[in-house]
Amino acid sequence: MDKKSRVLIVGGTGYIGKRIVNASISLGHPTYVLFRPEVVSNIDKVQMLLYFKQLGAKLIEASLDDHQRLVDALKQVDVVISALAGGVLSHHILEQLKLVEAIKEAGNIKRFLPSEFGMDPDIMEHALQPGSITFIDKRKVRRAIEAASIPYTYVSSNMFAGYFAGSLAQLDGHMMPPRDKVLIYGDGNVKGIWVDEDDVGTYTIKSIDDPQTLNKTMYIRPPMNILSQKEVIQIWERLSEQNLDKIYISSQDFLADMKDKSYEEKIVRCHLYQIFFRGDLYNFEIGPNAIEATKLYPEVKYVTMDSYLERYV
């Protein structure tokens, strides 16, 4: 049996990072979790780190601003996965450029997976502002990786189920299904791709030692989870035995309503526009420099949205 790579996860206490840490440990990889010195003041993150340690992970304290300490950490591992936050309220994507410099100096890293886990930034050059900032910064990191000739895999995992399926993709900030009415974008029939976060972790770790994913983008497109917003709503209505009042909003009204929103709200709405009006998750064919995860790893029994939504009933 081939020896499994030693994996360092940066951002391992975050929303998707903790799933990647769990998957790495579960799949038998020697797992290292990098944490920033200031994390010790956050009781929730400290408890999570101690939990990872109990499972067998090794904890490494280092700041991305401490170049030498970062290089020393990298020399202990084979693969680096970054799960640094790239969301609206906490956006640290360009911090990864420090990680790229450290990987270059360390010289031993066999694979780097930067923080992506959403839409493919290289096909989002048309994205609306200010939502485009996410994709602009991710492209900068990609180009730095490639310029440094660092072996990579980019993971495009589409919509996190917890944020999108759990809320039926509503704008109200609630992460539970609505009980009376639901907002539908356009006619509600544009296809999207909804993915369980634990499955994102599993597919990500599966890819790190696979030569088929080397220097490629890996899309996670579970066939049974390629669904429109309306189809996800119908699943929820069937499970909950409750019919929701449907409120439809046109693309014109949706965009017009953005004008008076905060910067953060505009970013969220831009991304929703790309997904549910333009269909940017599924309106393209996977090219020769990319590969699809469920075809690569058919042994993974991914969570369907029917199954996922049962927890909310």
From Swiss-Prot:
Q: Which residues form the active site?
A: K138 (proton acceptor)
Q: Name one GO biological process term.
A: (-)-lariciresinol catabolic process
**Family per similarity comment:** Belongs to the NmrA-type oxidoreductase family. Isoflavone reductase subfamily.
Q: What does this protein do?
A: Reductase involved in lignan biosynthesis. Catalyzes the enantioselective sequential conversion of (-)-pinoresinol into (-)-lariciresinol and of (-)-lariciresinol into (+)-secoisolariciresinol. Can also convert with a lower efficiency (+)-pinoresinol into (+)-lariciresinol, but not (+)-lariciresinol into (-)-secoisolariciresinol. Abstracts the 4R-hydride from the NADPH cofactor during catalysis.
Q: Which cysteines are joined by disulfide bonds?
A: none
Task: List the catalytic activities from the record.
Answer: (+)-lariciresinol + NADP(+) = (+)-pinoresinol + NADPH + H(+); (-)-lariciresinol + NADP(+) = (-)-pinoresinol + NADPH + H(+); (+)-secoisolariciresinol + NADP(+) = (-)-lariciresinol + NADPH + H(+)
Q: Which UniProt keywords apply?
A: NADP, Oxidoreductase
Q: What else is known?
A: Phe-164, Val-268 and Leu-272 are involved in enantiospecific binding of (-)-pinoresinol while in PLR_Tp2, a 'Gly-268' and a symmetric substitution between Phe and Leu favor binding of the (+)-antipode of pinoresinol.
Residues engaged in binding NADP(+): G11, G12, T13, G14, Y15, I16, G17, R36, K45, R142
Per UniProt, what is one GO molecular function of this protein? lariciresinol reductase activity
Organism from which the protein derives: Thuja plicata
Quaternary structure?
Dimer.
Q: What class of enzyme is it?
A: oxidoreductase
State the EC number(s). Answer: 1.23.1.1, 1.23.1.4, 1.23.1.3
Record: residues binding substrate: H271
Q: What is this protein called?
A: Bifunctional pinoresinol-lariciresinol reductase 1
